[in-house]
A protein has these predicted regions:
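Acidic catalytic loop of the alpha/beta-hydrolase fold
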Residues: 184-190
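Primarily recognizes the serine-hydrolase "nucleophile elbow" in alpha/beta-hydrolase
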Residues: 102-175
Length: 239
């Protein structure tokens, strides 16, 4: 886990040159923009991609500051990060309230810088710039989507927002193909499929996997939710 990141880094995990297929992925771990799940949603994902011939680049982007003490941080997060109380459920037929928009200017700048580095060093790393995409997990999924919708410098070939926000968005005409994964028992899932419908209605390619079990934060999959373990193969096969 990483916290209080004030300087972004980009770490490449490259495939065996004999197995490389030219595709590249920026991997953005999640953690509510307060910490980063570097192992479960960063290094493990990057290694799985590299094992399948895809150059992976783990982006450790800037975060909101948190308490210096790990104990204090855990206590704060336990109070503010959990399943919504039943009283917060909207009336039948009404969509849940959308969360307030966060300022992601720093994180977007970090993603744009990572993309620029990939373009600059593509030949060195054996990367096909026309096959460079981005995947992210929860907050990283939000950053992936934010980059897709708002960046003026990134031209992503594909995106994979994994168990991220599902609300509807305004899809650009040139939006990249999207691969989306979610578990139905994710405590943050509110029964919305807006982003999927938005992509579909815009006529842009989209593939969506809804697993019955897996909860939130399953990364590459849990042993007790074997279906989720297929997500890396599904994603790499899709790219």
């Amino acid at each position: 886990m990483a916290r209080n990141v004030s300087t972004a880094t980009l770490t490449p995990l490259l495939p065996d040159p004999a197995e490389a297929n030219g595709a590249a992925v920026i991997v953005a771990p999640g953690g509510a923009f307060r910490w980063l799940s570097m192992n479960n949603e960063g290094w493990k994902v990057a290694r799985a991609l590299a094992d399948r011939g895809i150059a992976a680049f783990v982006l450790k982007y800037r975060l909101q500051p948190t308490e210096p003490s790990l104990d204090d941080f855990r206590e704060r997060m336990s109070q503010g990060f959990g399943p919504p109380p039943s009283s917060s459920e909207p009336p039948a037929g009404e969509a849940p309230p959308r969360p307030g928009r966060s300022d992601l200017s720093n994180q977007l700048a970090d993603a744009e810088a990572a993309y620029a580095i990939l373009l600059e060093r593509a030949s060195e790393w054996g990367v096909d710039t026309d096959r460079t995409g981005m995947i992210g997990f929860p907050a990283g999924a939000g950053l992936t989507m934010h980059s897709t919708l708002h960046s003026k410098t990134m031209t992503l070939a594909f995106i994979g927002p994994i168990y991220g926000g599902m609300g509807p968005v305004e899809v650009p005409e040139d939006a990249p193909p999207m691969f989306n994964v979610l578990a139905s028992d994710d405590f943050l899932f509110r029964g919305q499929f807006g982003v999927i419908k938005s992509w579909f209605d815009a006529g842009r390619p989209v593939e969506f996997h809804l697993y019955q079990n897996g909860g939130h934060g399953f990364g590459l999959g849990y042993p007790d939710a074997p279906a989720t373990a297929g997500s890396p193969s599904s994603c790499t096969g899709w790219t």
